UniProtKB/Swiss-Prot annotation:
PANTHER family: PROTEASOME SUBUNIT ALPHA/BETA (PTHR11599). It comes from the Eukaryota. GO terms for biological process: proteolysis involved in protein catabolic process. It comes from Arabidopsis thaliana. This is Proteasome subunit beta type-4. Belongs to the peptidase T1B family. Keywords: Cytoplasm, Nucleus, Proteasome, Zymogen. Ubiquitous low levels, higher expression in siliques and flowers.
């Protein structure tokens, strides 16, 4: 006769089951900068498609710009899994809004305020969502662009950038942005910013998407690459002239 030993449950399995599930305590797979601007017809947003596992460029096909409802566009840098969690929150929010069927829909300002409260709430629980979010949109003919940090700090502006782009792209935008930008000029300005980030940010890759939102809706471009030039002398010997270098 075959006998089987049955382990005695001392209650540990119940304790494990009852423990609250944990989210990201430290970022693992992250995306780099998002750059967004207002232009005369709406909002443009650019991001590359890289996902870094620590310092290793592990994934090269991650979309970090998503349409939210009818009037909004969301981009995120930081932890990819937390961005997916935020998208689940927003799916639930827009579903509940649509269930009212009252002819109204959430605009970009409402979604921006909602995300601000979500990020601040998670920060107060010492379990933040490890992202910086960019929210753009158009409703009733008015363009809207704002940003939320991982600790719930939010603001609106005519152009925003996250991550390394906040240091390298914003100076370019301050010099060259103006309110009457056409779509073509806006795309060229974003491509200039993304090219600078590609040269200087180790986490950036030469595969990007540019999304547009207007009163007509959201359009996200197919992934494409920028023309680059790597023959600058400083690229061949980046430490030349620095103290202690050869």
């Amino acid at each position: 006769m075959t006998t089987f030993s049955v382990p005695i449950d001392n209650g540990d399995s119940m304790k494990i089951a009852e423990e609250e599930s944990q989210r990201t305590l430290y970022p693992y797979v992250t995306g780099t900068s998002i750059v967004a601007i207002k232009y005369k017809d709406g909002v443009l947003m650019a991001s590359d498609m890289g996902g870094s596992y620590g310092s290793t460029l592990r994934y090269k096909n991650i979309e970090r710009v998503k349409a939210i409802g009818k009037h909004s566009l969301l981009g995120a840098s930081g932890e990819i899994s937390d961005f997916q969690e935020i998208l689940r929150y927003l799916d639930e929010l827009t579903l509940n809004d649509n269930m009212w069927d009252d002819g109204n829909s959430l605009g970009p300002k409402e979604i921006h305020n909602y995300l601000t409260r979500v990020m601040y709430n998670r920060r107060n629980k010492f379990n933040p969502l490890w992202n910086t979010l960019v929210l753009g949109g158009v409703k009733n003919g008015k363009s809207y662009l704002g940003m939320v940090s991982m600790i719930g700090v939010s603001f609106e502006d005519d152009h925003v950038a996250t991550g390394f782009g906040n240091h390298l792209a914003r100076p370019i935008l301050r010099d060259e942005w103006h309110a009457d930008l056409s779509f073509e000029d806006g795309v060229k300005l974003l491509e200039k910013c993304m090219r600078v980030l590609l040269y200087r940010d180790r986490s950036a890759i030469n595969k990007l998407q540019i999304a547009k939102i207007t009163e007509e809706g959201v359009t996200v471009s197919q992934p494409y690459s920028l023309k680059t030039y790597w023959e600058f002398s400083s690229f061949h010997n980046p430490t030349a002239g620095a103290a202690g270098s050869w």
